[in-house]
């Protein structure tokens, strides 16, 4: 029991990992714990639009665990492609450390879910990636492009980096977002 409690206390640190997008109506940045919670709710709400049927519980588990490595590494904006490989290695070490607090059975399950998400090969992982890539778009569309403007993000970057992942896991959501992104481009929300 104590090792599980130690893990639960460790993941509380996700609440202090600041992301680049602001929650609607607030002037502060969201944190990774809020992000993971919102993704779990998105799966519950949007799973019927998945490209193929998915195991909803498995997908939710994946998303509540997918960013725990950020406790050690911090969050990096998805458009920071030049450091992506280095970040993957650092995050793997962090996830291994954090999951290493758990009993072997849970450690292996959680590491497996994290690895499945990172590989993005299963239907659940593809849908999870679609949710993960779409929520910053949804928030930016509601915030007049707040983090796009603050971070010098171009329309082409948003389409190129997010479109394939969202379309692969949730084509209907990508069709909706693409239309809204085109409107945002017309409104001048990108650099």
Where are these regions (language model features)?
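Alpha-helical, largely C-terminal catalytic domains
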Residues: 1-191
């Amino acid at each position: 029991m104590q090792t599980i409690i130690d893990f639960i206390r460790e993941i509380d640190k996700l609440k202090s990992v600041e992301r680049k997008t602001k929650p609607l109506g607030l002037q502060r940045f969201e944190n990774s714990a809020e992000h993971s919670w919102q993704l779990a709710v998105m799966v519950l709400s949007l799973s019927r639009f998945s490209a193929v049927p998915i195991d909803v519980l498995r997908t939710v588990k994946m998303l509540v665990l997918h960013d725990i490595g950020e406790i050690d590494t911090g969050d990096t904006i998805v458009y920071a492609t030049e450091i992506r490989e280095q970040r993957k290695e650092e995050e793997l070490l962090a996830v291994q450390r954090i999951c290493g607090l758990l009993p072997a059975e849970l450690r292996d399950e959680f590491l497996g879910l994290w690895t499945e998400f990172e590989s993005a090969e299963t239907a659940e992982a593809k849908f999870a990636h679609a949710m993960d890539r779409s929520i910053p778009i949804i928030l930016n569309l509601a915030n007049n492009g707040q983090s796009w403007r603050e971070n010098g993000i171009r329309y082409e970057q948003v389409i190129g980096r997010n479109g394939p992942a969202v379309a692969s896991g949730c084509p209907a959501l990508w069709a909706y977002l693409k239309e809204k992104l085109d409107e945002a481009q017309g409104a001048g929300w990108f650099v």
